[in-house]
Amino acid sequence: MASKFDLHSLVANWQNSSATAKAHWSGTFDEYLDIVKANPKVTRNAYQRMFDMIVEEGTEVYIDFKKEVVRYKFFDDKFNNGKDAVFGLDVQLMKLVNVLKAAALGYGTEKRVILLHGPVGSAKSTICRMLKKGLERYSYSDTGALYTFEWVDEKLELDGLLGKGVKVFPTPMNEEPLLLIPDDLRASVFEQLNKGQEGTYRVNVDGELSPPSRYIFKALMEKYDGDLMRVFKHVRVKRLFLSEADRVGIGTFQPKDEKNQDSTELTGDINYRKIAEYGSDSDPRAFNFDGEFNIANRGLIEFVEVLKLDVAFLYDLLGASQEHRVKPKKFAQTHIDEVIIGHTNEPEYRRLQDNEFMEALRDRTVKIDIPYITRWRDEVNIYKRDFNSQKVRGISIAPHTVEMAAMWAILTRLEKPKKANLTRLQKLKLYNGKTLPNYTEDNVRELRKETQREGLEGISARYIQDKLSNALVAAQQSNKGSVNPFMVFKELESGLKSHSLISDEEVKAEYRELLGVVMQEYEEIIKAEVQRAISADESAMQRLCGNYIDNVKAYTQKERVRNQFTGNDEEPDERLMRSIEEKIEIPESRKDDFRREIMNYIGALALEGKKFNYKMNERLHKAIELKLFEDQKDSIKLTTLVSNVADKDTQEKIDVVKTRLIKDFGYDEISATDVLHYVASIFARGDVKSK
C-alpha cells in the first residue's frame, strides 16, 4: 500500500529553512545600517543590480570569425529549463550588457531608454521577460538582496498620521531605506559606511523619498522637534522581493486605444475615497502611487511597442530617463530608480526617424538591434527546444525535418551575395562555419560587413513553429505516424498565400524559389545518406582508400605498384584512380594537382606523427563512398522498391540498408522506409550523383 503524502513535513522543512527565515527578515534602521556596513551591495541601484545579476550567471568567451564574443549564460535560462533561452544573438546581447555596465558605472547610459529594435518575432519580448524573471529570482538570493521600509505606529500614538486605525504604512514606491537620511547628513553617514570598503560599488544613494514618506517624515520630525533617532523608531526595514505579478519593482506598459489610456497609468492617480479622510486631494496619502513608473521603482519597467505610444506619454518617458523623475498629478517631481527598456518593430522605428518632433526621444535612446538569427545551427536549436521526442509524443519527426525548415527561414533572411559566383545557400553554410574553397574567415567577415539589412527581414521563427505544428497535427489526424520534410514544405508554401506580414507577390515568389533550393538540398542529403548506408562497409572503404593511396603515391613518385595477388610490379592503376576522382568532379587537367595535394597532406600528418585516415579529407571521403556505392548499388537493386517487386535476396539487402539508416542516421522504421522509397524513385530517374 502506497504511503500517504506528507504535506505537513514538507511545509515544516520549508518554513524552517534559512532561506525562508531570511525572506521574512525585518529589523530596525540601526540593524539595517549594520547590514549595509557588512555588505554595501544591498544599496546598489537598479542598473548595477541588473548588470551583476547577468554577470554572476557566468560567461563564456569564444572566437567567431576572428572576433572575440562574450556569451552570457544568463540568457540560457537554465532556471526555467531553457524555455526562454535565446540562441544566436550573443553579439547583440553583449552590446546590451555593455550598455548596462556603462549605466552601472554611471557613464551616462543610465539616463537613456534602452530600445530593442527588430522585426516581429526576433526575441525582443523574450529578452525582456528573462530580465524580469531574473530580477525576481535575484531578489530572493543572498547576492541580490535589497531592502525597503514601512512606517509603523504599533500603539496608534501618531493621531492617524498613517491613516485612521493604521498601524503599518508601507512606503508605496519601495524606496531604499537610506533615503530616510537627510541630504545634509548623507555625506558623513556614507563616508562612515564606506570606510574600509574595497568593492566595486560604494554606498552612494541618490534621490529622495516618495511624497507620502516625505510627508510622514516631515510630520514626525516636527512632532519630535527634529529628533531623527525618535523618527527612526517608527521605521521598520524589511527585505524587498520583486514580482511582476504583485507589481513590486517590475512594471509593464503597453499602448491601448488613446481614448482609454492616460498618463495616470504611468504616474498614479487620486484616491477619491481617501480625500474624505485627509481633506485634500493634494495630500500624498490620498494619492495612489501605483502607476507603472511608481511600482517599478528599484527594478525595471518594460514598454511594449514603445513607439506606438501617444506623444503625451513620451514626455513622461523623457523625464523618467534623463532626470530619473516623474511628475504625479499635483505633486512635485518624484525620484525613480529603475531600468527603462522598450522594444519596437521596424515600421514604428522608421516613423521615429522621420518625425522631427521625436528628436528629443531619439537623443535619449540607446538602440540595440535584435535581428533574426542568421546562423543555421542556432535557428535549429530554437525548434529542437519545442519539437523533440520528449515533447512530441505518439508521432515521430523524421531526420532533417526541423533542419530544413530552419534552413529555409535563414535563407529568407540573408541578402543576396554581391559576388556572382556565391549562392545564398553557400553563404548560409559559410555563416554556419563550413569551409568553402577560396573563402577564408576574412572573406566571411567581409560578407557580413557588406550587408545593409540582413536579419531585419524574412520569415520569423513563429511562422516556422506554426507550420511545424500544423504538419504534426495533420500527420496525427491522418495516422501517418511520422512527419517528414515534404509535409513541412507543403505547409510552409501554402501558408505564404495568406501570410499577414508579406503582401508583396515578388517577395512571396522569391521565398517559394528558396523553398525549391531547400528541397534540392534535402534530396542531396538523403541521397548521400542512402549511398553511405549502402556503402557502409568500413573495411571495404579502407581497402579501397588504401589501394587508391598506394597508386597515387606510385604515380606522384613515378614508381611501380606491387600487385598483391601476383607479386609483380605494375604501372599505377590509372583507371582506378580516375574512377574515384571523377566522383568529385576532378577533371583530367587537375588530377596531378589533386594527387599531389593528397600526398602533401599525408606527408604533413606524418611529420606530426599522425596516420592518415580517409575520413580526414572530406572530398576523398566522399569520393570513396560514391565509388563504393556505384560498385554495390547494382547488387542491391534499390530501384525494385519503385515497382514493389523485390526477391527475397534483394529485400534482405534492402533491409540491411534500412537498419543502417536507423542505427547510423537516426531514422525510425517509418521514416527510413519513406526515404528509401523516395531515393529509389530518384535513382530510377537516373539521378544518382550527389553534388
Question: Which role does the model predict for each range below?
Answer:
Residues 1-57, 118-121:
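N-terminal accessory segments that target, anchor, or regulate ATP-driven/P-loop NTPase machines
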Residues 40-691:
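Conserved ASCE/P-loop NTPase catalytic core
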